[in-house]
Design a protein with these regions (language model features):
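Extracytoplasmic cell-surface/polysaccharide-interacting catalytic and binding patches
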Residues: 1-47, 140-149
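Structural recognition of the beta-strand scaffold that forms the well-ordered cores
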Residues: 55-57, 82-86, 125-127
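Catalytic cores and adjacent binding grooves of peptidoglycan-active enzymes
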Residues: 87-149
Length: 149
């Protein structure tokens, strides 16, 4: 089963921590709907624009998995509303390009430049919700501290 044209269900729920600890990482039907909404409205427009593969490094997280990795209790990954992407995995595209394109062209709740340098994040976190108005909040995270852009 696919979440969208370019994201498989297995890819969307994959977690190394869940595998190592034998934890369930299965979304509820509501969370699955949120995942599909995020994929169709953020990831697929990215793929269409750049015409290159982009790796999803973290998508859905169950409460057990989120707790095991020390994730925030308010993480939108828990609702299937957030994904971490890394354009550098396949080459030919930078995370900075992805960040700036999302910022300029898409509706989103949070867009986070995760670690890295001032010119290139290690990965990009992006979220989208249907529960309320999206904030279009732009942040940078360095050394576990968040800074508003």
């Amino acid at each position: 089963m696919n979440i969208s044209k370019h994201i498989t269900y297995a890819e969307a729920i994959k977690s190394q921590q869940a595998i190592r600890m034998r934890l369930s990482n299965e979304p509820t039907p509501e969370h699955l709907d949120n995942m599909k909404y995020l994929a169709e409205n953020i990831f697929e427009p990215l793929r269409k624009h750049f015409k290159k593969p982009i790796a999803v490094t973290s998508f859905y997280r169950s409460e057990l998995v989120n707790r095991a990795i020390g994730g925030s209790l308010a993480s939108q990954h828990l609702q299937g509303e957030a994904m971490d992407i890394d354009a550098q995995v396949f080459g030919g595209l930078t995370n900075a390009e992805v960040f700036e394109w999302i910022k300029a062209n898409l509706n989103y709740d949070q867009l986070i430049w995760e670690n890295g340098t001032v010119t290139e994040p290690d990965w990009v976190h992006v979220s989208l919700t249907r529960r309320r108005a999206n904030r279009k909040q732009n942040l940078r995270m360095f050394n576990n501290k968040y800074y508003t852009l």
